């Protein structure tokens, strides 16, 4: 009895299909492992504080927040390079926006005085803790109040990408105990306290 004739092309296709199946079977474990690794990485990124949405304080009374603030420490920022004795002063305007006057000295605490005037507006009416700030229209930046003293004696300001951070005080200096207490809460917000640079305020750093 003669066997059935199988064309060469079909035999070749069958062989290639078998080899492909064998290849996939051999590499299936690697594919599964890779998927597991990707899943773990994604879960880790989601769980990491600096990838989560930055939380702000529950409520800000803007009338109490207005006034003069001294910069105690901050993340390095290109627009503040070589600046000392930095202060910020906020005042409410008739249109509901907030006027900002930032002052600092260039090079040293008795160096040339620099002043920048800008505006801010609330972007979250529920908390008043998220504001948009601009000094050159139409470029706006985020100003999020992420920690605040009950008596409005100090504040911590950040932004959602966590690239910038400022610790502010109503006085030019802050005692070390309070400063360390504020720093201890920063990691849970996705910030690295070691990146902070103390700000010189006149003849001393902003930290006692």
What role is predicted for each listed range?
Residues 2, 17-18, 44-46:
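Generic low-polarity alpha-helical segments
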Residues 1, 6-10, 31:
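Short hydrophobic transmembrane-like helices used for membrane targeting/insertion
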């Amino acid at each position: 009895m003669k066997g059935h004739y199988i064309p060469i092309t079909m035999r070749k296709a069958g062989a290639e299909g078998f080899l492909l199946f064998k290849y996939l079977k051999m590499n299936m474990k690697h594919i599964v492992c890779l998927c597991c690794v990707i899943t773990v990485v994604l879960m880790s990124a989601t769980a990491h504080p600096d990838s989560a949405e930055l939380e702000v304080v529950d409520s800000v009374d803007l009338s109490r927040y207005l006034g003069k603030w001294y910069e105690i420490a901050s993340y390095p920022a290109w627009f503040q390079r070589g600046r000392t004795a930095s202060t910020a002063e906020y005042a409410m305007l008739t249109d509901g926006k907030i006027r900002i006057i930032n002052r600092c000295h260039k090079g040293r605490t008795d160096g040339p005085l620099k002043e920048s005037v800008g505006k801010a507006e609330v972007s979250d009416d529920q908390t008043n803790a998220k504001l948009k700030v601009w000094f050159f229209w139409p470029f706006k930046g985020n100003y999020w109040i992420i920690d605040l003293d009950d008596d409005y004696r100090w504040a911590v300001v950040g932004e959602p990408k966590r690239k910038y951070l400022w610790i502010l005080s109503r006085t030019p200096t802050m005692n070390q105990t309070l400063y360390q207490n504020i720093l201890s809460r920063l990691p849970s917000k996705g910030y690295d306290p070691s990146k902070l640079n103390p700000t010189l305020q006149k003849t001393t750093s902003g930290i006692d």
